[in-house]
Amino acid sequence: MNIFNNHLHETDKEIDEIIKHEKLRQNSVIELIASENFVSPAVLEAQGSILTNKYAEGYSGKRFYNGCEEVDKAENLAIERVKKLFNCKYANVQSHSGSQANQAVYLALLQPGDTILGMSLDSGGHLTHGAAPNMSGKWFNAVSYSVNKETYLIDYDEIERLADLHKPKLLIAGFSAYPRNIDFARFREIADKVGAYFMADIAHIAGLVATGEHQSPIPYTHAVTSTTHKTLRGPRGGLILSNDEEIGKKINSALFPGLQGGPLMHIIAAKAVAFLENLQPEYKSYIKQVISNAKALASSLQERGYDILTGGTDNHIVLVDLCKDGITGKLAANSLDRAGITCNKNAIPFDETSPFITSGIRLGTPACTTRGFKEKDFVLVGHMVADILDGLKNNEDNGKAEQKVLTEVTKLIKLFPFYTR
């Protein structure tokens, strides 16, 4: 078989069918998973290009392989564009994921056994910020801070107390499920007080930071990490930023050869495309719409009597606390899925249920905002979600409500077609 003569549908019908079905699924549902988004055809084209063939260990101009002239140009473009996007002096675009971006910073700045201080998982933190099952919780002495038990907001005085007590080498700000703004300046004050490095993981809010809709951590941190998907609407991958170019040199060495081998040049090219898209004026309008849509979604659920954690949102995340409703997050997410609405079960602060069950759900607006949804559409979505939750409160077999909402979902999404070719 000459592999160059056949297309996917000729070579592997099974994978071709899977991709077709997934395309149909993405077109057919209301996507509320806060960490997901839809990339442009241009990003897809770069990601699926022949750049996937090129091995390029090292950095631009200092590769261990010949023939890297063109991929060097692609990586240089990605770096210059993202530095402009975030107004910073240093960027590394090679990390394969946000988790590996975090690991590279740890490898650059810490030694095994050093103390790190990050947000606990049940308060909205991320696995890589010191959770016990993660390497960050195994290699380091990981201490966690929580949100306030009454307001569910970050308690900066408590973080300062813990920092004074434990003297961390690294203080981490960032989250996977926290709906309010972060005071990076306050974090830096705490870090300086105890002589710690300060890292911000902005994987969820990178788009908000890039457009000025959230305080930038760049002036206050030693290192900033992010994913390149989520609100940045690029390919799945990671990113590291800093204004400290000496720390940048350490991070470069930590990522390669310390942590990774060859970078994924097709992904880096796709990152460059996404960064160019994000430098356009339309992107700022998009992020503003993401936030407005999240506020509309939260308000519509509150009107239906559901508890929204912290009473609302400043970003793209809406956390629904289902404790008083007697519904688990798992039950709610599965029922919503059958009704054509995808989200994820999510722990709420001080949750006593299993992380596989949870007492809440996490909703997000980036993906459907990309499709073109506005506030009025998210008000409708909020009522659809509430209809499913109402049904679960009264009857664990929620088939009737699911079918009704699925019909409404199908009607709404037909107004917002995408990936049509």
From Swiss-Prot:
Record GO biological process: glycine biosynthetic process from serine; tetrahydrofolate interconversion
Residues the UniProt record annotates as site (Plays an important role in substrate specificity): H229
Broad enzyme group: transferase
Cofactor requirement: pyridoxal 5'-phosphate
Locations listed in the record: Cytoplasm
Protein's pathway: One-carbon metabolism; tetrahydrofolate interconversion; Amino-acid biosynthesis; glycine biosynthesis; glycine from L-serine: step 1/1
Protein name: Serine hydroxymethyltransferase
Naturally occurring in which organism (per UniProt): Rickettsia felis (strain ATCC VR-1525 / URRWXCal2) (Rickettsia azadi)
